[in-house]
Amino acid sequence: MPNKYGLSIVKDFPVKGVNFIDINPLLNNPEYFGPVIDRFCQLIRQNAADYLKKAAIITPQARGFLFASPIAYKLGLPLVCVRKKGKVPNKPYIFHINNEYDSYDMEIDSDLLQQHTHYIYIDDIFATGQTLAGIKEALAKKQKTIILALHLTAVDALKDIRSNTEALKEILSLEVI
């Protein structure tokens, strides 16, 4: 059953015991997608106004790209994409992430990373917080900071096992499932 943004939950996908949040209905409907992008932009203006001239948006592949790209465009902010290992052709900064059902290396273009000190993190789902925590830790090793983290939705059932992300100024989600 879709929620107010058109999201639906697919049980036991991609592995047994994991409930996958399907964002395709949201992406397929401009009447849902447009207001979501507008709301993200509004939250960034409200919660990171002091950083808008010096921050960049950072987002993990691949679903984060779908939200972060139009937001970066609308706000006139640079976009730095975090990719799985082997996808960055120029000077990759490589780090490791463990998430709820996988473990893998991620990478960021070192030249792009060097250009900014403050980041606004955007992703679709806030589940265990492992992706956010891994990127936050990788940035900290390079003296970079995430000042705001935004997610389309947070999985309420996982709030007690989320990674250590309390040092962030704000972690906001448009809704909780």
Where are these regions (language model features)?
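Short, glycine/charge-rich flexible loops or terminal/linker lids adjacent to PRPP-binding catalytic cores
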Residues: 77-120
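Active-site-facing substrate-recognition patch
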Residues: 1-51, 109-112, 116
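Short glycine-rich phosphate-binding loop at a beta-alpha junction
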Residues: 50-61
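Structural motif
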Residues: 55-56, 118-120, 148
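Acidic, divalent-metal-coordinating active-site segment for phosphoryl/phosphodiester hydrolysis
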Residues: 123-133
